[in-house]
């Protein structure tokens, strides 16, 4: 159904709630086939506040308001007490407190209720909200937690990650923090908390729609394992000129790599492990202090950073909350911040002094594969560049290093070609 057809439909004047515990297919099984809704919100929840129960699942509906939420509301208990919301709550979640708060503040104007609510809420959040007496409209606002949106002939879409709607439109924009988005069949509007209209800054993703599909593979992880050689090639090739590392296409000035006293690498999860490999690469060539810090702890310590310190932050999505907050802290101490991210225009990319985009394409499997290997390849290039600028290696040595890096995709292809052999070995070993 197109947007034009949506405009001709009678919009239901009620909020129909469907939620369950389990997989998305379990939710689909309880949804009505004859439902004539023209807009909806949904969320797959990883439990933070409260257990895995039907009552704790999103959306949460309180009075006139239905809401989904990605993030953590740090002062939810204080809000429940201040606004006397406890009697309205049936779940154990911080999210339901937000729904109850917005409902409490709602006096007919959805945007005004959201303005008042976000002024009270502390923490990270991305809200999508329905108001019963404003059918056919979705309202959204965020702080820190990611949110992207688009509008096209097939409809208006909003999500935490653009892979959710890339099959419909490659153009998208990142919803700015503390801006209220209104979405209808007629389009998307955006305004700041003072009510001033803001024009969305659209970007276009540069990978094909099939990159977000299994494309004949049994699952995404095996597909993404096989995509590693191409991903590494896409990442390193534009950054090699005359067999030397070159970041001119990234607009990274050569001076950025000069006069570096020490390096701190900040990341979470798999990206932190890539950082550990990067530490070895850089430290072995430069012989300067290199530390790796987990982002969730970095901002709670007094960082030993000065104006000659380089801070490298690593995040596949570019929206990892702890890493983003660590970057914001680092920016107060040094202008030498560099991010290694996979998503163009992401928050971490925008707030770094310089950004090194990896070209892994979307990584949908939970277990990281190609995103990790392109991060390691990026560190290899950086180590080589830093060593050259610090005069720790010669041009000839640098070319030897780069030649080795260029061979890595071929080595991976050779390993992957032996997959049938590895499969047989695994079957023999698994019950040994």
Enumerate the language-model features and the residues they cover:
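Conserved short-loop catalytic and cofactor-binding motifs
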Residues: 86, 102, 266, 270, ...
């Amino acid at each position: 159904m197109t947007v034009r057809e949506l405009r001709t439909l009678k919009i239901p004047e009620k909020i129909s709630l469907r939620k369950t515990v389990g997989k998305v297919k379990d939710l689909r099984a309880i949804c009505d086939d004859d439902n004539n809704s023209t807009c909806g919100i949904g969320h797959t929840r990883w439990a933070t506040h409260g257990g895995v129960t039907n009552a704790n699942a999103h959306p949460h509906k309180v009075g006139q308001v239905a809401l989904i939420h990605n993030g953590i509301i740090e002062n939810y208990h204080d809000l429940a007490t201040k606004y006397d919301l406890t009697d309205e709550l049936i779940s154990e979640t911080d999210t339901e407190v937000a729904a109850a708060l917005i409902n409490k503040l709602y006096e007919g104007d959805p945007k005004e209720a959201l303005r008042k609510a976000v002024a009270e809420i502390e923490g990270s959040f991305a809200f999508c909200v329905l108001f019963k007496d404003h059918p056919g409209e979705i309202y959204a606002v965020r702080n820190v937690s990611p949110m992207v949106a688009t509008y096209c002939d097939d409809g208006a879409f909003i999500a935490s990650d653009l892979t959710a709607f890339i099959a419909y439109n490659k153009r998208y924009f990142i919803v700015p923090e503390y801006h209220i988005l209104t979405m209808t069949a007629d389009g998307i509007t955006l305004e700041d908390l003072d009510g001033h209209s803001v024009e969305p800054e659209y970007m276009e993703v540069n990978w094909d729609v099939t990159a977000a599909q299994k494309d004949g593979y049994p699952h995404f992880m095996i597909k993404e394992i096989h995509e590693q050689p191409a991903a590494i090639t896409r990442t390193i090739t534009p950054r090699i000129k005359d067999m030397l590392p070159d970041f001119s296409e990234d607009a990274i000035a050569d001076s950025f790599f000069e006069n570096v006293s020490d390096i701190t690498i900040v990341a979470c999860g798999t990206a932190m492990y890539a950082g550990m490999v990067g530490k070895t690469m850089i430290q072995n060539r430069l012989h300067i202090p290199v530390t790796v810090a987990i982002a969730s702890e970095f901002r709670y310590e007094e960082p030993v950073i000065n104006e000659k310190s380089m801070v490298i932050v690593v995040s596949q999505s570019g929206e990892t909350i702890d890493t983003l907050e660590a970057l914001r802290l680092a920016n107060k101490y040094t202008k030498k911040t560099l991010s290694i991210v996979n998503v163009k225009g992401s928050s971490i990319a925008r707030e770094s002094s310089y950004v090194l985009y990896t070209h892994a394409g979307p990584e949908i499997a939970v277990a990281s594969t190609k995103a990790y290997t392109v991060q390691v390849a990026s560190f290899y290039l950086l180590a080589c560049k830093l060593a050259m600028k610090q005069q720790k290696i010669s041009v000839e040595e640098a070319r030897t290093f780069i030649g080795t890096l260029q061979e890595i995709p071929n080595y991976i292809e050779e390993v992957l070609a032996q997959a049938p052999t590895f499969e047989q070995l695994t079957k023999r070993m698994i019950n040994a």
